Amino acid sequence: MSVEGITQVVRDLPAFHDLNLIVGAEGASDAGVYRLSDELWIVQTVDFFPPLVDDPFVYGQIAAANSLSDVYAMGGTPKTALNVVGFPDDQLPLEVLSEILRGGAERVQQAGAVIAGGHTVRDVEIKYGLSVTGIVAPDELMTNRNARPGDVLILTKPLGTGYVTTAAKKDRCPDNVLAAAIQSMTQLNVVGRDAARAGNARAATDITGFGLAVHAAEMALASGVTIQLHVDHLPLLTGVEALVEQGFRTRATKSNRQFAESLMKIEGGPDTMRLEVAFDAQTSGGLLIAVDPSMADAVLQSLRTAEAAAASIVGSVLPKQEHALILVRHVV
């Protein structure tokens, strides 16, 4: 669904009032957080989607990494997961589902969590993901509502998975470009969480289907600030620039930009390729971390030690202005 449609539906839901519900549905948070005791809070999330790649094992890896990401974005540690499956068993052999589940289990195992069960329904197309429960210490919780003026913004993974997977579905994506995107999408965001901890960060969000620009705007609105992104500083996956020029955009790219129009202003030069990529729907994208400038080097060093070479400072947090988001383009 589009961000606009989801926002409308959630707006009509009843509010829940419980002092132990630390983070709920408000503010477009990445996951829910519930206090079991003063020392132990649980983090809960669920995510699933249709295949983006042909290999069922790799699809399972990507879907699991994407589901686990929300727990990492909150500063948490995944502990248990439940498989969520839609599968056309009257059309495809069960070996396909076995490979999907095997790929998901491999990523869950890498995360140090366990799969405790799941639920499967017959569907007209494949869908797979996880419901994940994690834990977080109160002093390590990160949310999208804690960005502060003066913070710098670090993006931990390059952008462009929407363009790559769209081109791949049409058999128009070079093998090396798809391989680079798969490597990024299957990488667990524990790397970003650990880097955020190294920088004592308290604000983060993961970049997924609504794209960098919308997720940044959501962080700005939740935090009561304005976020400024420098478009020309955005890191891109290998080969994405050519795919943008060839027009392999997702439908979500257009709807993401339409939703953001009233929340943002654009400064600087003419539209650039990187400006469009700011709205590209990501799958298992990186974390956007807001951190004090004095700790930015510690965060980047942690990321690069973990081979997240594309990690970059992409913007900053400003006092609240008329617009939640400012996109700055280089003036030639």
Feature map (PLM): residue ranges:
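Helix-biased detector of long, well-ordered alpha-helical tracts
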Residues: 1-332
